[in-house]
């Protein structure tokens, strides 16, 4: 749980995922736990975007909490973005969020980061991995995935794209 990664390059910051963790049984009175993103608060003006890899709570559950303190564009695939919108509305987030739809296979520039998304199989449809390119090199951010060549949603992991990156 609490999946959240921050990449820094050339003065820019890119956040990937913002999830929650559900408490252990002995954590009475706690509904959920969010990532500690205090490090980013005094650097909020350098955050260029938040990319979400898929719609599970451990990857989207803290989006509202991040946006309340670090207003930044949120990039996600259609299903994932829909889940985020519903969750934010249900939880009373009434600020106008900058939500941007991306498709698997798309390349986008977010500050100094070029982000290319690619299909990955997972237990939820519309999941993507990320190829993040900077002047320092390439980062493959896989997030959650499974090896399944016949997924229910018909979108197997894009092994050819992964081979291109290697």
Question: Which stretches of residues belong to each language-model region?
Answer:
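His/Asp/Glu-rich metal-coordinating catalytic cores
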Residues: 1-51, 56-166
């Amino acid at each position: 749980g609490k999946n959240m990664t921050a990449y820094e390059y050339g003065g820019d910051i890119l956040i990937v995922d913002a999830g929650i963790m559900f408490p252990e049984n002995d954590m009475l009175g706690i509904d959920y736990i969010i990532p500690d993103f205090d490090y980013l608060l005094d650097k909020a003006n350098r955050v260029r975007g938040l990319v979400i890899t898929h719609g599970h709570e451990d990857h989207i559950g803290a989006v509202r909490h991040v946006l309340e303190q670090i207003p930044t564009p949120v990039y996600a695939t259609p299903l994932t973005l829909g889940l985020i919108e519903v969750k934010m509305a249900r939880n009373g987030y009434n600020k106008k969020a900058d939500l941007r739809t991306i498709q698997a296979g798309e390349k986008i520039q977010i500050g100094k980061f070029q982000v290319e998304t690619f299909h990955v199989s997972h237990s939820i449809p519309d999941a993507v991995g990320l190829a993040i390119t900077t002047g320092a090199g390439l980062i493959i951010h896989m997030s959650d995935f499974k090896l399944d060549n016949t997924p229910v949603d018909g979108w197997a992991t894009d092994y050819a794209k992964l081979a291109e990156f290697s």
